From Swiss-Prot:
The gene is pth. It comes from Haemophilus influenzae (strain 86-028NP). Belongs to the PTH family. GO terms for biological process: protein quality control for misfolded or incompletely synthesized proteins; rescue of stalled ribosome. This is Peptidyl-tRNA hydrolase. It comes from the Bacteria. The lineage of its organism: Bacteria, Pseudomonadati, Pseudomonadota, Gammaproteobacteria, Pasteurellales. TRNA binds at Y17, F68, N70, N116. Pfam families: Pept_tRNA_hydro (PF01195). Gene3D superfamilies: Peptidyl-tRNA hydrolase. The keyword RNA-binding applies. Signal peptide: none annotated. Hydrolyzes ribosome-free peptidyl-tRNAs (with 1 or more amino acids incorporated), which drop off the ribosome during protein synthesis, or as a result of ribosome stalling.
Amino acid sequence: MSEIKLIVGLGNPGEKYADTRHNAGEWLIERLARRFNVSLNPESKFFGKTARTLVNGKEVRLLVPTTFMNLSGKAVGALASFYRIKPEEILVIHDELDLPAGTAKLKQGGGHGGHNGLKDIVAQLGNNNNFYRLRIGIGHPGHRDLVAGYVLNKPSPADRDALEKVLDEATDCVEIIFKDGMIKATNRLNSFKI
């Protein structure tokens, strides 16, 4: 199993989107940056904010693309290419409509499930979808016509509370990836209940 060398948190740039459901991936990267005591700094050649840290003696880069969600692959592709990071060494954190708020799942590979950020990352990595995903449940509005408005709005207070709890657990589980391995982290996160 490859070691994770790049952790990406997806979201949309700007204050307007900062607290919206679609930015759940960015929320987790910000928590990881605080946990690892590093600052995310703008890096124009990577189209995002980046940080470098050591986790359990291993060098890891954090990335929040500053492109809009549907162009996230531009940032991921640029950084991965520059540092020669393979798709299987990347963990992408993103919001997931098909999971209820307060849940999260880790997995490797798979389709994009209609998520435009994932779709662009797969394309920019040469149609390779073998990267890891940490999917943060945000719930579903009930009908596909409501999805765009739903992901670009703030969660309800109850959902925000559930998200805070699962983000705490996910932060711990990302650290477990580096200490005890992906399988242990996956088993713990995928069985988490609030």
